[in-house]
UniProtKB/Swiss-Prot annotation:
Protein's UniProt name: (2Z,6Z)-farnesyl diphosphate synthase, chloroplastic
SUPFAM superfamilies: Undecaprenyl diphosphate synthase
UniProt catalytic activity: 2 isopentenyl diphosphate + dimethylallyl diphosphate = (2Z,6Z)-farnesyl diphosphate + 2 diphosphate
Active site per UniProt: 86
Transit peptide per record: 1-45
Organism: Solanum habrochaites
Compartments, record wording: Plastid, Chloroplast
Protein's gene: ZFPS
Length: 303
């Protein structure tokens, strides 16, 4: 007798029927935790079946339909995704590699995510590349990152995306500052996805620089105290784009780490244990599906 113990989501039928001498498509499913196959090969069949069965003993704790394209709602697509790209160092250490090998995946993986996001109709990605606190890391690692960030132009200048950099640029190496200026100038006319990279950025820093700018304008008679409101403050922040709808953090930690503190007030958060170098198309779609299943009230009530 074949046996199947599972939790199942997003199948075209709420019930699963097992019969002998038929096959189960493992390619259509993900999240298999336990699998026992006694002396029988597993036959791959067409995807999308609403009846699945097998002639072997299959035990699983979680079975989930993987074909996420049909589950995405274009009308509920987030316009702006904030991304904390965490887990590069752990990815390298888990493989017995130097941490630099993990960091090398940052821009290629980010470009991959931008390509996927563009096809899905997402308009803005804001990616946290280097925080104001990351200077505390070992000098060798920081030096490597500064050199690696100079690959920005080669990676994105011909990608079709518009690139903007936020953060305190004056503290960065001069060669990197020139690379940033060249990349922003080269891509400013691109009509595709807007990629905002937070480099030497922190939420505290952004709020403080906005406050100082407003105070300076008030002291110089350029605005009255009564003119100061949320909209004015928004304009003084470096991000200068609509606030994120969805924040995705890879690597398992569940905190914002001083990222976009003002802008995340009503953002939906999604945390995944997947390390950033392993974060791919299905992971992104899974995060978006999770986002689309939420009811955003923005502090109000809907009945």
């Amino acid at each position: 007798m074949s046996s199947l113990v599972l939790q199942c989501w997003k199948l075209s039928s709420p019930s699963l029927i097992l019969q002998q001498n038929t096959s189960i498509s493992m390619g259509a499913f993900k999240g298999i935790h336990k699998l026992q196959i006694p002396n029988s090969p597993l036959t791959v069949s067409a995807r999308g079946l609403n009846k699945i069965s097998c002639s072997l003993s299959l035990q699983t704790e979680k079975l989930c339909y993987e074909d996420n394209d049909n589950d995405l709602d274009e009308e509920l697509m987030p316009k702006h995704i904030a991304l904390i790209m965490d887990g590069n160092r752990r990815w390298a250490k888990d493989k017995g590699l130097d941490v630099s090998e993990g960091h090398k995946h940052l821009f290629p993986k980010l470009k991959e995510i931008c390509d996927i996001s563009s096809k899905l109709g997402i308009q803005v990605i804001t990616a946290f590349a280097f925080s104001t606190e990351n200077w505390k890391r070992a000098k060798g690692e920081v030096d490597f990152l500064m050199q690696m960030f100079e690959e920005l132009y080669d990676e994105f200048s011909r990608s079709g995306v518009r690139v903007s950099i936020i953060g305190c640029k004056t503290d960065l190496p001069m060669t990197l500052q020139k690379c940033i200026a060249l990349t922003e100038e080269t891509t400013k006319g691109n009509k595709g996805l807007h990629l905002v990279i937070a480099l030497n950025y922190g939420g505290y820093y952004d709020i403080l620089q906005a406050t100082k700018s407003i105070v300076n304008k008030a002291m110089n008679g350029l605005l009255d105290v009564e003119d100061i409101n949320k909209n004015l403050f928004d304009q003084e922040l470096e991000s200068k784009c609509p606030n994120p709808d969805l924040l995705i953090r890879t690597g398992g930690d569940q905190r914002v780490s001083n990222f976009l503190l003002w802008q995340l007030a009503y953002t939906e958060f999604y945390f995944t244990k997947t390390l950033f170098p392993d974060f791919g198309e299905e992971d992104l779609k899974e995060a978006i599906i999770n986002f689309q299943q939420r009811h955003r009230r923005f502090g109000g009530h809907t009945y």
